[in-house]
Amino acid sequence: MNEQYSALRSNVSMLGKVLGETIKDALGEHILDRVETIRKLSKSSRAGNEANRQELLTTLQNLSNDELLPVARAFSQFLNLANTAEQYHSISPKGEAASNPEVIARTLRKLKNQPDLNDATIKKAVESLSLELVLTAHPTEITRRTLIHKMGEINNCLKQLDNTDIADYERHQVMRRLRQLIAQSWHTDEIRKQRPSPVDEAKWGFAVVENSLWQGVPNYLRELNEQLEENLGYKLPVDFVPVRFTSWMGGDRDGNPNVTADITRHVLLLSRWKATDLFLKDIHVLVSELSMVDATPELLALVGEEGASEPYRYLMKKLRARLMATQSWLEARLKGEKLPKPAGLLTQNEQLWEPLYACYQSLQACGMGIIANGELLDTLRRVKCFGVPLVRIDIRQESTRHTEALGEITRYLGIGDYESWSEADKQALLIRELNSKRPLLPRNWEPSNDTREVLETCKVIAEAPKGSIAAYVISMAKTPSDVLAVHLLLKEAGIGFAMPVAPLFETLDDLNNADDVMTQLLNIDWYRGLIQGKQMVMIGYSDSAKDAGVMAASWAQYQAQDALIKTCEKAGIELTLFHGRGGSIGRGGAPAHAALLSQPPGSLKGGLRVTEQGEMIRFKYGLPEVTVSSLSLYTSAILEANLLPPPEPKDSWRHIMDELSVISCETYRGYVRENKDFVPYFRSATPEQELGKLPLGSRPAKRRPTGGVESLRAIPWIFAWTQNRLMLPAWLGAGTALQKVVEDGKQSELEAMCRDWPFFSTRLGMLEMVFSKADLWLADYYDQRLVAKTLWPLGKELRDLLEEDIKVVLAIANDSHLMADLPWIAESIQLRNVYTDPLNVLQAELLYRSRLTEEQGKSPDPRVEQALMVTIAGVAAGMRNTG
């Protein structure tokens, strides 16, 4: 096993050495010596040397303000390099990758070996595959785009160095390039100076498409096709592309006043512009490659006499001209010019598909299949996956905004105040108006700014080319009227088709009521007629965990999904569950394969739609090869979940989960909501207040500027606890509940659940992962340095609880140590701890200095503030997730 990691370790130490040389060149030997001393002390402290641990603390506390930034940057940059090496390891022939595309082959073989499954059934499951990944601009992507690009280049260098027959002079060239890149990174400011605007975030999303997905998706489809041919003798149809991408960047206005209707309009245009840009590059290649003369009569008829000598080129050049005209028009629109639409403006995917597919069919018919299945096939698949919009956009808005808008309308019309009506009265008005032929909105009415914004957004959806908006998501949805209200507002804007409207259920109570709300909606005849047998529902992971703790939330999510699946099945409705899970465990993140197989039976029948957030986008789709591997994992998990569904849990297991849920929720809320010391402790023991200074995302950290934990967004809440290594939201309450059930004599039942029920074993696996990243001595050190003595007992109580929780989880899982079944992850955490620990200690020191300066009424020292931001970014890199 260690053989596998030796390549990773040697890359990590080689990159570290180059970084050391860079630091020495930039700042001199003494700074490098200081960094090296700290690194060695940290390594020894990790190995259990108490004297060196004390020396590490003293050394870091005694750094002068001038030394703070270089030391913080050294460890932070090192972690970024270690992550780059690890990402490369996951795709290198010597590392994990050797087996990743194999995952599809393994799954197909496993399915073929099932006595009750035949090839036709498997083929049918493949044909109904549907995977929609929704890219969200959570403020968790802490690394700047500039640096992400350099990391990608470093990755290429590692790939070249891995080549066994590389000549010495080539090796020297690659090493020189590596030194340049690491020096460029060192001399680049890793912290953004301004918050990104929603448009910047959208551009970041387009960069992921251009740099990785554009190549990764066709490569994945080739891989999938190869495995299907080999194992089932089945070829994928040309137009079969089971994966699509949607984005929340520029569409998600929930709690983000910076995302306006104008911004969404701009991002839609920008997205189309980027699509023309990328397709132009493809067509440019095809113009030069498709020089063939032989063509079918159909193709020759299409090009006429003018194009007969080089029919394929002729068609490609015509398509290129259309793309260029479309691009010019979009450019003018983006600059605010109002131009008439040119003839042949590309607005629908068919306009791109038809000429390309005509060439494909002709090449196949004329015996040139090998040419047809080259670049041309990749471009055809990109048309299906990305098309004219590039990525579709979801619109997301909070339910109360629609209620307020309708309240304003009804008050103006003199028919009462919609906001204060009962649910039955609201539904009566909405259904009456939805059935009515006359408009609801008065012509000369001047709405308030907030209402105008809601109505304008609906207008943007109505104007957008069909297919460029994927869904309208209603956050904090609680009642049927929340869904009907959006349908009415969309109707008023002139949308003539059934736009998918997805309620998002995200608190414990809302999850528990989700099935009831959907049952009521499906009982409304008008609604049943509108949705034409299809319904999307979004399950919120992050807010429910923040509301009730991770154990109660995950059981509520399971039960809500289970009930919705059964209700929709009975009603003959195709349900798509949309999972809003984050990168971190406290926000529902889990290794994809395990997470999907742990859902209720039938939950993936309508395909998988899931958010991919912030830094997870880079870890899963940052390079074409990583994209292939991530999409392959998803594909095999969906096939397996649909063809070999997990067992229905026994009634006794459900009762135990109900019990665990109640106890864990009471424990969690007992601390977070009811303990008067908790909020002051949270504010002082974590960098929660300082996080607000980081220019991370375009959305504010709080939904409302005042208030306690409940007003915080789920992401800063998790981010803050990840920084001080207590990782509290991801475990609080869970272990206490498990302990209580063990004491009631049900340990053997829990062990059986762990063995035979994927839902439960995944929960425990996620707890183990969090426990591996948590650190008691560091959390204790934050308390000693930053927390008032009166609050120390609370910190001690929480740490003792964590220690007890670890013991009980290991006992139920029958493991002697954490992550026993995932040594690769344990290895990766150990490797990074040596570099993350000094950043944590330094962060506590910087928080202490920064807060002291503030208390003394002095103006902040920019060196301290900058170093603090760097430690926050560094710890995030070390933990491999932020919020």
UniProtKB/Swiss-Prot annotation:
GO terms for molecular function: magnesium ion binding; phosphoenolpyruvate carboxylase activity. PANTHER family: PHOSPHOENOLPYRUVATE CARBOXYLASE. The gene is ppc. It comes from the Bacteria. It catalyses: oxaloacetate + phosphate = phosphoenolpyruvate + hydrogencarbonate. It is an enzyme of class 4 (lyase). SUPFAM superfamilies: Phosphoenolpyruvate/pyruvate domain. InterPro entries: PEP_COase (IPR021135), PEP_COase_bac/pln-type (IPR022805), PEP_COase_Lys_AS (IPR018129), PEPCASE_His_AS (IPR033129), Pyrv/PenolPyrv_kinase-like_dom (IPR015813). Forms oxaloacetate, a four-carbon dicarboxylic acid source for the tricarboxylic acid cycle. GO terms for biological process: carbon fixation; oxaloacetate metabolic process; tricarboxylic acid cycle. Keywords: Carbon dioxide fixation, Lyase, Magnesium. Belongs to the PEPCase type 1 family. This is Phosphoenolpyruvate carboxylase. Pfam families: PEPcase. The active site is at H138, K546. Its EC number is 4.1.1.31. It comes from Salmonella choleraesuis (strain SC-B67). Its cofactor is Mg(2+). GO terms for cellular component: cytosol. The keyword Secreted does not apply. The keyword Nuclease does not apply.
